[in-house]
């Protein structure tokens, strides 16, 4: 008798969706959208040591994080044009593209939708302007030594891009940080 009851209880439990599958189904019902952004690893050609421009800003959870300058493409804009514009808006630096680096592709959930985001990154060189985080999107913009920049970056994908850029620029990997 006990075996039958426990078997019935097991079947009953297994026929009920788990909280994980409920969450997955709820997530699948959210509408999706595609977003495309661009930015770059901006190199300071005049510094005593190789330096890159980093910005600090608040993420979706309100935490202060450091990242590479980047932002959404505007209507009719190429990824390269958007990268140059976003770098100037977020850092005050006038930059030119040296090389296309890589794209990062990921998903996240925001405001009742799932977002598929692609971010195109470029290696860029500062050719003018003055670094400043004086705008409403960025808390701070700073030149950071290339060898120390990866330790500041909040996102693993950006750390990988920085290591790749360093190998391309200097022929060696970044120091652990």
Residue ranges and their predicted role:
Residues 67-70, 114, 150, 168-171:
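Short, charged/polar low-complexity linear motifs in solvent-exposed/disordered segments
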Residues 58-59, 71, 159, 167:
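Hydrophobic alpha-helical segments, especially transmembrane helices
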Residues 10-11, 16-17, 76, 123, ...:
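A periodicity- and composition-biased signal for non-globular, repetitive helical segments
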Residues 47-49, 112, 172:
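Short acidic/polar alpha-helix capping motifs at helix-coil junctions
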Residues 73-160:
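Unchanged
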Residues 55, 98, 102, 137, ...:
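Residue-level detector of alpha-helical recognition elements and their boundaries
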Residues 21-23, 156-177:
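Charged phosphate-binding loop/patch that engages nucleotide di/tri-phosphates or the phosphate backbone
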Residues 3-4, 8-68:
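N-terminal strand-loop-strand
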């Amino acid at each position: 008798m006990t075996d039958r009851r426990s078997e019935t209880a097991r079947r009953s439990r297994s026929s009920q969706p788990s909280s994980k599958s409920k969450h997955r189904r709820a997530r699948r019902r959210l509408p999706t959208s595609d977003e495309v952004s661009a930015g770059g690893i901006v190199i300071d050609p005049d510094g005593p040591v190789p330096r890159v421009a980093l910005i600090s800003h608040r993420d979706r959870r309100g935490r202060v994080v450091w990242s590479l300058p980047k932002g959404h493409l505007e209507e009719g804009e190429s990824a390269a044009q958007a990268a140059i514009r976003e770098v100037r808006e977020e850092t005050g630096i006038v930059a030119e593209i040296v090389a296309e680096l890589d794209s990062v592709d990921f998903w996240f959930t925001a405001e009742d939708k799932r977002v598929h985001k692609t971010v195109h990154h470029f290696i860029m060189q500062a050719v003018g302007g003055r670094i400043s985080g004086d705008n409403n999107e960025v808390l701070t913009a700073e030149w950071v030594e290339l060898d120390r920049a990866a330790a500041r970056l909040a996102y693993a994908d950006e750390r990988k891009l920085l290591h790749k850029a360093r190998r391309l620029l200097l022929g060696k990997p970044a120091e652990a940080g």
